[in-house]
Amino acid sequence: MGRKKIQITRIMDERNRQVTFTKRKFGLMKKAYELSVLCDCEIALIIFNSSNKLFQYASTDMDKVLLKYTEYNEPHESGTNSDIVEALNKKEHRGCDSPDPDTSYVLTPHTEEKYKKINEEFDNMMRNHKIAPGLPPQNFSMSVTVPVTSPNALSYTNPGSSLVSPSLAASSTLADSSMLSPPQATLHRNVSPGAPQRPPSTGSAGGMLSTSDLTVPNGAGSSPVGNGFVNSRASPNLVGTTGANSLGKVMPTESPPPPGGGNLGMNSRKPDLRVVIPPSSKGMMPPLSEEEELELNTQRISSSQAPQPLATPVVSVTTPSLPQQGLVYSAMPTAYNTDYSLTSADLSALQGFNSPGMLSLGQVSAWQQHHLGQAALSSLVAGGQLSQGSNLSINTNQNINIKSEPISPPRDRMTPSGFQQQQPPPPSQAPQPQPPQPQPQPQPQARQEMGRSPVDSLSSSSSSYDGSDREDPRGDFHSPVVLGRPPNTEDRESPSVKRMRMDAWVT
């Protein structure tokens, strides 16, 4: 692509003609200089413009060149404009023809600038388009339940995800690498019969954990999801979140309860894990006898391997991707863990009841605090060694600001059932662990508090619903989990504690 050619005719515009003359005169002198140097010759240029102004150029000395010219008498080449035009026509340069048909193929500097700008904008658009699918949606929230109580339940998680992989950082201590299985092989392993299945969600699906032995009921419809995670925007009843409410209130499900008293059967490989979903907000789970509880505790202890370095408990982790709702996500500082560490006696007081929908633990080793990146989703308690068979529920659901549709009857303006929040004593003053006591049916007066799980009395999360029921929290710290326990056996046998255990019985 060369310079745009113009028609060689007289320029009518005076100003344009003057500019062209100046530029081309300098170009001509430049060419004369190059020729004189390259070919070792003498050149003299004599130019008169349209106004008879003289411009001359000589490679050495004009008088010397002119003297040599006047004294030269031999035949020589002499050319005029007509000779140049004829020479150009013979060489088919067509210098006199108008090159208008070629203008569409010639790029001027201005046109090249436009093309470069268009190319840069297109490259930026393509680059942003490629990056956009990898970003998690800002208004999209996922709820993930991670059961890792036996070697067969350890699922594979994408290391590139900052949501779940930090909570399973301790899983690298497991010796058997064959416990890891890709989530694609376990997406559709356990689905309730006779119900349609929802396809896997597309938002950040690569980083979500797929639980191979968990059936998640969907409270918004009648389709259980077997892929291990549920879109919490479409299902108000999630495993481990009790109706997507971090206070543990029971939301009624529109779908009929599954057979067997609301128990969803797990896979035959883990008979000790069952997800218990209350049929409605006014129903309560049937009590378990002492023999059944002891049998389940024995199964939990026996199912955990002795040489296994870590048996990760079941934790419901929810993506805190709704910053516009004003929820406070606060990390649990290390000082909290040292001042209020869990002991065997504390867990014995908490043994036997969990939040409805949470999965009970098997053998639990030492916990460590996991800080989940910018979301500050760290409510895993880093305490001492936990006793075998101890039950502990940690609800970190912060996905939805529930402010409407309370289904349960009106509640008292106090902590549920009078179960006061107490700080656990130091480990040096902790009593010995006590076995769980069989509990009879709760008293009828506790029916008005049935909609609230005991996790509410444990100050489960930082939801804005019923915020006036508690004391005013500190502005700089919101404790996701405050574990309270009855101070002695008499308090644990009180009707309020009995109602709380019955309200959240998990097997």
From Swiss-Prot:
Where is the site labelled Cleavage?
D176, S177, D213, L214, D466, G467
Q: Which residues carry this modification: Phosphoserine?
A: S59, S98, S235, S255, S355, S408, S453
Q: Which residues carry this modification: Phosphothreonine?
A: T312, T319, T415
Which positions carry N6-acetyllysine?
Answer: K249, K403
Where does the source fall among the domains of life? Eukaryota
What are the UniProt keywords, alphabetically? Acetylation, Activator, Apoptosis, Developmental protein, Differentiation, DNA-binding, Isopeptide bond, Neurogenesis, Nucleus, Phosphoprotein, Transcription, Transcription regulation, Ubl conjugation
**Where do the record's region annotations for Disordered lie?**
175-269, 390-507
Instruction: Tell me where the cross-link Glycyl lysine isopeptide (Lys-Gly) (interchain with G-Cter in SUMO) is found.
Output: K403
**Does this entry carry the keyword Lipid metabolism?**
no
Where is it located? Answer: Nucleus
Q: Which residues form a coiled coil?
A: none
Provide the Gene Ontology terms for cellular component. nucleus
Compositionally biased intervals (Polar residues): 209-245, 390-402
- The record's DNA-binding region positions are 58-86
> Low complexity compositional bias: what residue ranges?
453-466
Give all residue intervals belonging to the MADS-box domain. Answer: 3-57
Mod. after translation: Constitutive phosphorylation on Ser-408 promotes Lys-403 sumoylation thus preventing acetylation at this site. Dephosphorylation on Ser-408 by PPP3CA upon neuron depolarization promotes a switch from sumoylation to acetylation on residue Lys-403 leading to inhibition of dendrite claw differentiation. Phosphorylation on Thr-312 and Thr-319 are the main sites involved in p38 MAPK signaling and activate transcription. Phosphorylated on these sites by MAPK14/p38alpha and MAPK11/p38beta, but not by MAPK13/p38delta nor by MAPK12/p38gamma. Sumoylation on Lys-403 is enhanced by PIAS1 and represses transcriptional activity. Phosphorylation on Ser-408 is required for sumoylation. Has no effect on nuclear location nor on DNA binding. Sumoylated with SUMO1 and, to a lesser extent with SUMO2 and SUMO3. PIASx facilitates sumoylation in postsynaptic dendrites in the cerebellar cortex and promotes their morphogenesis.
Q: Which CDD domains match?
A: MADS_MEF2_like
Which family would the database say this protein is a member of?
Answer: Belongs to the MEF2 family.
Q: Which PANTHER family match?
A: MADS BOX PROTEIN (PTHR11945), MYOCYTE-SPECIFIC ENHANCER FACTOR 2A (PTHR11945:SF637)
Q: What job does the chain carry out? A: Transcriptional activator which binds specifically to the MEF2 element, 5'-YTA[AT](4)TAR-3', found in numerous muscle-specific genes. Also involved in the activation of numerous growth factor- and stress-induced genes. Mediates cellular functions not only in skeletal and cardiac muscle development, but also in neuronal differentiation and survival. Plays diverse roles in the control of cell growth, survival and apoptosis via p38 MAPK signaling in muscle-specific and/or growth factor-related transcription.
Under which name does UniProt file this protein? Myocyte-specific enhancer factor 2A
Q: Which gene encodes it?
A: MEF2A
